[in-house]
Amino acid sequence: MRNSSRSSVDPFIVMDVMEAARAAEAAGRHIIHMEVGQPGTPAPAGARAALSATMESDALGYTVALGIPELRERIASLYKDWYNLDLDPARVVVTPGSSGAFILAFTALFDAGDKVGLGEPGYPSYRQILRALDLEPVGIATSAENRLQPVPADLPPGLAGLITASPANPSGTMLDHDHLSALIGATQDMGASFISDEIYHGLQYEGRAVSALEVSDDVYVVNSFSKYFSMTGWRAGWMVVPEDHVRVIERIAQNMFICAPHASQVTALAAMDCHDELNANLAVYAENRQLMIDGLPRAGFDRFAPPDGAFYIYADVSAHTDDSRAFAAEILEKAGVAVTPGLDFDPVRGHQTLRFSYARATEDIREGLARLTRFMEGRG
């Protein structure tokens, strides 16, 4: 049986690294995980308790495609709490993770063959989802001077859309209001659609994360319960779309997904009020971030932009290698630390970069830094 040309997507390298780390653990080794952007904490205890109680009284069948009304209303209220925005809950769409939101957004906004810009380095699945939908991803090389974020002068002509992320994966850098406003304005002047990936909002350490909705209502905003709310495996996310796009998205969602998992929606609703636990998680990430900023240079990784948010550091390792994939494999084998090659995020320049995640427990971060230091000292 033949495969479609659309199925020729690249592997998600971090998942391959995870599998190599799992195999090492199965062989009896202790591995420190700095490869994956997955919180070391579970969904908040209060959220899990709410689901347990609901399961005793509710069959948890299909919900409406846009999500349970209570959750959409609570998400809308988050925009008041975080950004002082009055958001109509009717514009909120609950999705099966942010990946589901991107599939819906790309399907609603673009036609086959359209060109969609994305900053590089950037989240690799943008490119692969676009290709699978017969769209053309256009990588936009960013610079260290602009903290690895695109600026209007970088945008090529002919784009049907632009995707940005702030805080960004893999760099953790953020777009301030002026920078975001300039990008949205330039995109709209081109007649292109603007998609803002905001899944790391809530995880910021230097300044406030700005939502694209503070600039314009004529944008798509994607968010998720995976990161700030520690719900990666629950596959629950959301997006906010212009009022006149809601019905379009609803029709596509009805046919593609029916609904986001009901159990995950119940859990997500309760998670949004578990403030003490969420704040405690953020304090751990802040401590881990400082450990990494201080410890990575001592280990020999001193070329990176300090992250404003998320839980990653993206380091230039050109002084050590021209093959980040082989270098990451060497670090896993000899140091017992799993890290992600930059090729996942930048297929052109990523052979000289690594991403380090500090989402795990603080004791793991300390041990990982100690191992990296010993490894680099031994490597010469």
Predicted segments with their positions:
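A short helix->loop->beta-strand "cap" motif at the edges of active sites that frequently abuts
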Residues: 114, 135, 189-192, 217
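N-terminal small-domain helix-loop-helix segment of the aminotransferase-like
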Residues: 2-97, 104, 271-274, 291, ...
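Conserved glycine-rich beta-strand-loop-beta hairpin in the small C-terminal domain of fold type I
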Residues: 269, 285-293, 304-317
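Active-site phosphate-binding strand-loop segment of PLP-dependent enzymes
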Residues: 142-206
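PLP-dependent enzyme catalytic core of the Aspartate aminotransferase-like
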Residues: 77, 81, 330-339, 345-380
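Active-site PLP attachment segment
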Residues: 214-248, 263, 352
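PLP-dependent aminotransferase-like
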Residues: 90, 108-165, 185
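Structural signature of PLP-dependent enzymes
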Residues: 249-254, 272-294
